[in-house]
Amino acid sequence: MAYLFTSESVSEGHPDKIADQISDAILDAHLAEDRNSRVAAETLVTSGLVVLSGEITSQARVEPREIAREVIRDIGYTDPRIRFDAESCGVISSLHEQSGDISQGVDGGEEQGAGDQGLMFGYACRETEELMPMPITFSHRLVQELAHIRKETDKMPYLRPDSKSQVTIEYKEDRMTPRRVHTVVVSTQHDEGVPQKKIREDVRDILLPRALPTDLLDEDLILHVNPTGRFVTGGPHGDTGVTGRKIIVDTYGGKGAHGGGAFSGKDPSKVDRSATYAARHVAKNLVAAELCDEAEVQLAYAIGVAEPVSIDVSTNGTGVLPDTELCEMVREHFELSPSAIIDRLDLLKPRYQKTAAYGHFGRPTFPWEELTHVEALKRDAPAVAS
C-alpha cells in the first residue's frame, strides 16, 4: 500500500513570514554594527499596523521602524489598496534592554552558556539532493517560484504577495522512497476580478513546470488552486501575523521532531536557533557520510551551561552502526557548546533575514548545510565498528 506524507509552506508575503523577516532584519542590523549584540525581537503585523517588541542589548544604533518599512517594501506591499503598505502603515516600537539576570550566565568567550534551556532537533534524509524531505522542499519551491514570477516576470500579473502551498508525496512501501507527487494545493492572493479558471490554468501551465520535476508529475495529480474560490483579501489585512508561528514550515515540514522553539529575531546565543542549526549540520553530515539513510539528532541545554546536557542520534533503523555508536561519533567530532557552534557555523554574520522565508534548511548558501565532517566521519566509522 502506498504511503502519503504532506507538508506546507508559505510565501514571504504571508503575515507570519512578514513578521519573521522584520524580526531577522532588525537582528541583522544590530549584528552588522555590533557582533556581540543580544537580540530577541518580536513583530506583530495587522491591518495597517506593525508592532515591534522584545529585548535588545547592543552598541549598535539602528532605526527599527525604517527597517520594518524596508522589509515590507521589498516583499511587495506597496499598494495602499490592499490595506497594508510600506509607506502608510503605522509602526510602533517597544524594544527594550535584555535582563541582566540572563546576560550574566550567557556572555563570555569559550565558556559562554546557553541562552536558555530547551531541546533542539536536526534532521536529514536521502529524499532530495539537499538531503531534505521532499514534501517540504517542493512546497518551498512552489511559493518561492510564485514570488519570482510576481516580482521578476510579466507572467501572472494579477499576483499579490500572500500565498501558501501544500504538497503530498506518494512513497513506495518502504515509506522512504518517493514515487510521485500525489496532491498539490496552491492558494495565492490575486487582484480583484481575475477568473479562478485563469489562475488555475496558470498554476498548472506556468508554475508547476517551473517549480517541480516533471517526471514526478502525472495525469493522476490532484491539483487544488484557491479552493475557497477567491483570495483577494490577504496579507496582514486578512490575517494578523506574529514572529515564530511557522516553526514547522521553517524546519522539515513535520518530518522528524521539533523542540518548540522559534528562530527569527533571536541572536545565536539563543540555542533555540544556534543549536537547531548545529543539529541539522550534524544530521546532514551523518547522512552524507553514508552512515545512515535518515538521521534525527537531539541536543538539549540548560541556561547558563556551556555543554549540552544530552545528545541523541536516531536513524530509524537505517544506520550502518548502532545509534549509540553514531552518537559517540557525534560527541567526538562535533563541539556543541554555544561558542563552538557560533564559531564553526559563522553565526555572528548578519545573514538571518535570508533564512526567514522559504525554510532555514536545505539551502546551500548557509554554513550549517556544508559537508565539513563527511571524510572524518567516514574514516572513523570502521574504527568505531571494530
UniProtKB/Swiss-Prot annotation:
Keyword Zinc among record annotations:
no
The protein here is known as: S-adenosylmethionine synthase
**EC class of the enzyme, as a word:** transferase
InterPro entries to which the protein is assigned, alphabetical: ADOMET_SYNTHASE_CS, S-AdoMet_synt_C, S-AdoMet_synt_central, S-AdoMet_synt_N, S-AdoMet_synthetase, S-AdoMet_synthetase_sfam
Report the principal subcellular site.
Answer: cytoplasm
State which Enzyme Commission number(s) the record gives: 2.5.1.6
What's its catalytic activity? L-methionine + ATP + H2O = S-adenosyl-L-methionine + phosphate + diphosphate
Where are the annotated segments for Flexible loop? Answer: 98-108
The cofactors named for this UniProt entry are:
Mg(2+); K(+)
Q: Which GO terms describe its molecular function?
A: ATP binding; magnesium ion binding; methionine adenosyltransferase activity
Q: Cellular component terms, GO, for this chain's entry?
A: cytoplasm
Subunit structure of this entry?
Homotetramer; dimer of dimers.
Q: Where does L-methionine bind?
A: E55, Q98, D239, K270
- Binding-site positions, K(+): E42
Residues involved in Mg(2+) binding: D16
Q: Name one Pfam family in it.
A: S-AdoMet_synt_N
Question: Where along this sequence does the record place binding of ATP?
Answer: H14, D162, S163, K164, R230, F231, D239, R245, K246, A262, K266
For this UniProt record, the keywords arranged alphabetically read as follows: ATP-binding, Cytoplasm, Magnesium, Metal-binding, Nucleotide-binding, One-carbon metabolism, Potassium, Transferase
Q: What is the species of this protein?
A: Salinibacter ruber (strain DSM 13855 / M31)
Where does this protein act, in terms of pathway? Amino-acid biosynthesis; S-adenosyl-L-methionine biosynthesis; S-adenosyl-L-methionine from L-methionine: step 1/1
**GO term, biological process aspect, one:** one-carbon metabolic process
Q: What job does this protein perform?
A: Catalyzes the formation of S-adenosylmethionine (AdoMet) from methionine and ATP. The overall synthetic reaction is composed of two sequential steps, AdoMet formation and the subsequent tripolyphosphate hydrolysis which occurs prior to release of AdoMet from the enzyme.
Family under the similarity heading: Belongs to the AdoMet synthase family.
Question: Bound how, and how many: what does the cofactor note say?
Answer: Binds 2 divalent ions per subunit.
